[in-house]
Regions:
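Composition-driven, intrinsically disordered low-complexity tracts enriched in small residues
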Residues: 2-365
């Protein structure tokens, strides 16, 4: 089921787009190759619920979603699916896993019923729907050719925060398995928001300052990916797989830390908050291995393992849990953090006591 009725003022449409958590976002990313006869949009969590709230113009916002990915003559359609996260919005709602499965089938059906070229856009939970549809279409021997369908995903947790747990981990609360997106023949553009906890997750979660910043990033980054300006998007990688599909990843860099955005919102002068950002940003960035300089061997989590980069840039396993093993993983992390903290405490004690000068590390921590 799809709908394509865009009504309401531009102000209303932008209001609706900016409030939903990735459900309806309008991005200014310009990608000529993404222009198509039809654009199918899979909204984010709860977009269907808000569709029934009076004066909340979700459907109207969809018109602004589509216009950045198509020419004036192209059409847009929003694919209907539960977009739920049980037990929200109600106890009768499907689980996230079931919601994603329904959305995947609906997107596949919509693609197969479309004529000409198609662009599938996934937003937040909808990006996981798009990933599933991509795999299903690719597996179908009668599926559309590579050149007829293209995918664009925003704030995709499957390509982001899901990498914290082992491949295939079943998450009961979501009723969903954390698996990497299937390699397909289709091209996909991946839009990542810096400090968005779903698409740009901190892989050193023991950094509490980073965690606090990421929590606020859910409100200030994840929900606002759709109002990015074209010049804000930086291409960070382009990879072509064995089937010929190319994945291009773009980063929407954050000018300000989400952690200090509330201060700006209540009227604290930007000059003062900018100073706070200068002090806090290195601390926040220390929670992301992607921010590491060459030769940095501090540990981080990848697919449920505590790993560190070697001098050659290759991942080296520090601690390996069992298949699920959350207790073993947490014990490994605690042991590693305790070791690092002990070294820091030892150096600090020596420096404060004045017995000797604190020595530099050997690069192993």
């Amino acid at each position: 089921m799809v709908w394509s009725n865009a009504v309401g003022t531009r102000r209303q449409r932008l209001f609706g787009a900016s409030l939903l958590a990735g459900a309806t976002a309008a991005t200014t990313l310009t990608c000529p190759a993404a222009q198509a006869d039809t654009m199918l949009i899979a909204g984010g969590t709860f977009y269907s619920f808000f569709d029934h709230v009076p004066y909340f113009p979700v459907k109207a916002a969809a018109g602004d979603i589509g216009r950045w990915f198509r020419s004036a003559d192209d059409g847009w359609q929003v694919v209907d699916y539960p977009a739920s996260f049980w037990p929200l919005p109600s106890l009768a709602s499907p689980t996230a896993g079931r919601s994603i499965a329904i959305g995947t089938d609906n997107v596949v059906d919509a693609v197969n019923r479309s004529d000409g070229t198609v662009v599938v856009v996934g937003l937040s939970q909808g990006s996981v729907v798009a990933d599933g549809a991509m795999a299903k279409l690719d597996a179908d021997p009668n599926g559309p050719d590579r050149g007829r369908v293209r995918f664009i995903v925003f704030g995709d947790p499957q390509r982001g925060v899901a990498k914290l747990v082992p491949e295939g981990t079943y998450i009961p609360l979501l009723d969903w398995r954390a698996t990497a997106p299937t390699e397909t023949k289709y091209d996909v553009d991946v839009i990542v928001g810096e400090y968005d906890p779903l698409s740009d997750y901190p892989d050193r979660p023991w950094n509490l300052v980073t965690d606090a910043n990421a929590a606020l990033g859910m409100a200030y980054v994840h929900t606002q990916l759709g109002v990015s300006k074209p010049d804000d998007l930086q291409e960070v990688s382009r990879e072509t797989n064995s089937k010929g599909g190319t994945t291009t990843t773009y980063l929407d860099a954050a000018e300000n830390l989400p952690l200090t955005r509330p201060l700006r919102d209540v009227g604290v002068p930007d000059a003062l908050v900018d100073k706070a950002d200068e002090v806090l940003r290195p601390v926040v960035d220390a929670g992301y291995s992607r921010k590491d300089k060459a030769g940095d061997t501090r540990p981080y989590i990848y697919r449920g393992q505590l790993v560190r980069a070697t001098s050659s840039g290759v991942k080296s396993v520090v601690a390996t849990p069992q298949r699920v093993g959350p207790q073993k993983l947490s014990s490994s992390i605690r042991a590693e953090v305790a070791k690092i903290a002990d070294k820091v405490t030892h150096r600090t004690t020596r420096a404060v006591g004045g017995t000797s000068k604190a020595t530099a590390g050997d690069g192993s921590d």
